[in-house]
């Protein structure tokens, strides 16, 4: 997807009609931190990038010496509890994103970060949950995308063409509207 002159674009994908579909885990649900951390460590040893969406999963990894290539965070867990500030990285980006939506401009920002060899942190003013979608679409096959499943554990998605197809299918069902 290419968006030209994205500074002038004030459009979002809205997902109100897809809440039920988006509420289920789309990868491997880990409820045991040791098993989760072992899995992530092995993925890194194989040369794949680890990308996190959410403050809690980012913090758990950092506390265990695993620094994600890209972190997408909003400073909260469950929309209200203040969380950690990510380990400072060379590249930090600030974006605004409303709950239940994805701003068009965020697709390009995430794609550019994932192409960069240094990674970075995206700080979201608003809600970061749905940003798993542009992350998956921009990640390389084999990369690991991790997000938190409230009151359940961490969901790990191993990016491949099938998951990208599923995410594109969800994106096609979203409604485009002004942000």
Swiss-Prot record:
Pathway the protein contributes to: Cofactor biosynthesis; coenzyme A biosynthesis
One Pfam family in the UniProt entry: DUF359
Annotated protein name in UniProt: GTP-dependent dephospho-CoA kinase
Family in the record: Belongs to the GTP-dependent DPCK family.
A GO term for molecular function: GTP binding
Coiled coil: none
PANTHER family, per the entry: GTP-DEPENDENT DEPHOSPHO-COA KINASE, UPF0218 PROTEIN TK1697
Catalytic activity: 3'-dephospho-CoA + GTP = GDP + CoA + H(+)
Amino-acid positions noted as binding GTP in the UniProt annotation, renumbered to this chain: 55, 57, 74, 76, 128
Listed GO biological process terms: coenzyme A biosynthetic process
Keywords, comma-separated and alphabetical: Coenzyme A biosynthesis, GTP-binding, Kinase, Nucleotide-binding, Transferase
EC number: 2.7.1.237
Keyword Lyase: no
Primary role: Catalyzes the GTP-dependent phosphorylation of the 3'-hydroxyl group of dephosphocoenzyme A to form coenzyme A (CoA).
Organism: Saccharolobus islandicus (strain M.14.25 / Kamchatka #1) (Sulfolobus islandicus)
């Amino acid at each position: 997807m290419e968006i030209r002159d994205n500074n002038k674009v004030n459009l979002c994908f809205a997902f109100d009609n897809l809440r039920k579909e988006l509420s289920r885990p789309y990868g491997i649900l880990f409820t045991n931190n040791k098993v989760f951390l072992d899995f992530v460590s092995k993925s890194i040893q194989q040369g794949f990038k680890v990308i996190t969406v959410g403050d809690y999963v980012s913090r758990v990894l950092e506390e265990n010496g695993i620094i994600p290539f890209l972190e997408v965070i909003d400073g909260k867990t469950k929309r209200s509890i203040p969380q950690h500030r990510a380990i400072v990285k060379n590249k930090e980006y600030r974006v605004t994103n409303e709950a239940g939506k994805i701003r068009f401009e965020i697709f390009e920002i995430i794609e550019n970060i994932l192409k960069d060899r240094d990674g970075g942190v995206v700080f979201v003013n608003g809600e970061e949950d749905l940003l798993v979608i542009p992350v998956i679409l921009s990640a390389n096959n084999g990369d690991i995308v991790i997000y938190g499943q409230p009151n359940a554990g961490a969901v790990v998605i191993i990016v491949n063409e099938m998951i990208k197809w599923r995410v594109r299918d969800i994106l096609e069902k979203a409604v485009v509207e002004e942000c």
